[in-house]
Design a protein with these regions (language model features):
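Nucleotide-activated chemistry modules centered on ATP-dependent adenylation/adenylyltransferase
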Residues: 1-281
Length: 281
């Protein structure tokens, strides 16, 4: 089986790219069409557009993730394949509602589907995928393995042909999840120490800045850091009805959060990757 390193832009998956040789390194980028979220460096925008094969306007993650992946490619000395799917706007338009913890179609459409389509083009037979779960994340690994079929492979529903004028859908087995950091007992402290004084820049926190898995207080802090991006998330609420907000269980809108007063200064260290949403593969 071919071996693929799945990269999210964080220190953990980047550690895998730097320390575990694979046939491919693949990174899936979340994009937006919104010019208010324009990536500021025109030259880098063009580089990213060339890598993706489609115009790159901006991302709804921290812009630093772009520099992370460019730095990482130089540091490891191996090509990183960049992939992308629909823009977040198009994903929401197709769904007609917002995602939530039980229907994380944002992750499926913007992370998994682009990687699956890349796999179809380049490999198209079951392959091993190194996933960035650390030694203390065995429960996450267990949940992933519980989704595999009898052959130990994850499946994807995809178009496999045509039936008259209609698409013919089928189930394709494609990914054998592998957890090298769990196998080698690698914890966060080892990874943090490894990246000290290395020429790779990292974002403070990965995944979309307005991910609904983040604590509302963290969303307020993210608004202070990335006002245009959080306002993008706020603008997408109430697609379906008045209670169609990112925090459905709380009936709490991003506009409510944005209006909160800053009673105390929230420091970066008040939050960790448990607050990030874990959308990275």
């Amino acid at each position: 089986m071919k071996l693929i390193n799945c990269l999210s832009g964080g220190k953990t998956s980047s550690y895998i790219a730097a320390n575990y040789k694979a046939d491919y390194n693949v990174f899936s980028l979340v994009r937006t069409n919104d010019k208010k979220c324009l990536f500021p460096d025109a030259k880098i925008r063009q580089i990213v557009s060339d890598k993706l094969g489609i115009e790159f306007i901006g991302t709804l993650e921290d812009d630093m993730i772009i520099y992370t992946m460019l730095d990482l490619e130089q540091y490891v000395g191996n090509k990183i394949d960049w992939v992308t799917g629909k823009t977040f706007e198009n994903v929401l338009n197709s769904a007609g509602t917002l995602p939530d913890p039980l229907r994380r179609f944002c992750t499926t459409q913007m992370k998994l589907v682009p990687m699956f389509k890349w796999w179809q083009r380049n490999i198209n037979k079951p392959a091993k995928f190194n996933l960035g779960f650390r030694a203390n994340e065995k429960r996450r690994a267990k949940r992933t393995l519980e989704k595999t079929n009898k052959n130990g492979l994850l499946e994807m529903k995809a178009i496999v042909g045509k039936r008259k004028t209609q698409n013919k859908w089928g189930i394709i087995e494609w990914q054998k999840p592998v957890f090298p950091l769990i196998k080698d007992n690698i914890f966060k402290d080892t990874i943090v120490e490894f990246w000290k004084n290395k020429p790779v820049r990292f974002a403070w926190m990965n995944n979309c800045v307005g991910c609904f898995h983040k604590h509302p207080l963290l969303i307020k802090k993210m608004h202070n850091k990335f006002p245009n991006k959080i306002e993008w998330f706020a603008s997408k609420e109430k697609i379906k009805h008045e209670k169609d907000v990112w925090y459905k269980s709380k009936n709490l809108s991003f506009n409510d959060i944005i209006k909160w007063d800053n009673q105390t200064e929230l420091f970066d260290d008040d939050f960790n990757e448990c607050d990030s949403g874990y959308c990275g593969l």
